[in-house]
Amino acid sequence: MHLISYKHFVPNSLNLENLFDSLQNVAWTSHGPIELDDIDKRILLSRKNNESLEIKSVDKFPCLTDYIIPPSVRIGDASRVRLGAYLSEGTTVMHEGFVNFNAGTLGPAMIEGRISAGVVVGRNSDLGGGCSTMGTLSGGNEVKVSIGENCLLGANSGLGIPLGDNCTIEAGLYITAGSKITTYNSNNEPESVVKASELSGCNNLLFIRNSQSGAIEAKINPKSVALNKTLHKN
């Protein structure tokens, strides 16, 4: 995890198979990691000695910032970024953002949503508040989700396919691999209905839900995301 967070290796480049089987749950505290069999005694001892012992979490992974402070990165709530997160310079993780291990950003990015394990986000992309990306830790999902450069995931949206560059998903729209999507040509005319998985990695797409029919539509994206540079001068 240190090698990834120090950015010696990008996410998904190391063999992490059976990692969870090899790690134990540990109490991560202000005095460092403590085995769960010892935590009750340590709590009593700290009270006896009038010492402060803060238990930050009980988990297999500590918070990133307990061990590594990435350069030129802003993190609103350090408890929401695990060790093993890969955060590039210029990344801002707001208070509701979350970054799992073996996941992260490949350039400046605004993170107000969830980056699940195995997910990477391209340069100058924006994950809106409450949005979600599907990881590979549970649920049988073997597709590694990625987000290209200059993309926007609207608030409370979701993504279950790899997204190309310059793509936008409207707020509240969750796209899974099996979602049926109507594609439109450059004349804004409907062409065909395809599974979202067939659009994996395609660039310059705008994903919206038709407010009258409820159908999911993919059109040519007329805009490109531009991050507020002031917010990313970390």
Where are these regions (language model features)?
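Terminal amphipathic alpha-helical/low-complexity segments used for targeting or macromolecular assembly
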Residues: M1-D66, E198-N234
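Alpha-helix boundary/capping detector
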Residues: A27, R123, A177-S179, K195, ...
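A mid-sequence, solvent-exposed acidic-amphipathic segment
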Residues: T65-I68, R80
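A structural motif detector for beta-strand N-caps
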Residues: V73, S79-V81, A85-L87, T91-V93, ...
